[in-house]
Amino acid sequence: MYILATAVCLLGFASAQKVTKLTSCLTKEKNLRMDCEYELTAATPVPTCTYTQENNVVGSTDPAKSQDPTFKNRGAVAIMEGISTCRLNLTGFSDDKPKNFTCTIKQKETVSKTSTVEKKLLLQCSAWSEHGSMLMLTVTSLVLLLEAKWL
């Protein structure tokens, strides 16, 4: 009985909708780019994504959300096809003080994650920053497979 209850609880947590990672970097043009990676519980309905800064909407894929005038024509949000990532591109990102940005994903549930962004501490966006962990995992796996073959 306890095993069944534990299994049900663990499966429930394993399939929960969540934001797994929120990263930020500076583009070559010195604009802010944020990637919000998420996991969904179902393929439908299509999720919406909203980025806010201090309760002001920076950008959203939800047509019901009005963009704050401060970010009009500066903030663009898009859900990246096939990789469960919502991307914010913000032009004219000032470097006066750290700012809190929140990514909110809404599908069946609403989940969010907040990150403090300080321009002077941001790294340059690159292919390595996007795919570095995947590349490292691939190389490590390849080395382990080659070692296993020779044992």
Label the predicted regions.
Residues M1-A16, K108, L122-L151:
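Type I single-pass or GPI-anchored cell-surface glycoprotein architecture
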Residues T20-T27, Y38:
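Short beta-strand segments of immunoglobulin-like
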Residues K30-M34, C86:
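Structural beta-strand segments of beta-rich domains
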Residues M34-C36, P47-Y51, F101-T104:
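Core motif of extracellular immunoglobulin-like domains
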Residues Y38-L40, G92, I105:
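Non-cytosolic beta-sheet module surface loops
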Residues E39-R74:
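N-terminal V-set
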Residues P69-K97, Q107-E109:
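Extracellular beta-strand/loop-rich beta-sandwich domains predominantly from IgSF
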Residues N100-Q124:
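Extracellular/luminal immunoglobulin-like beta-sandwich modules
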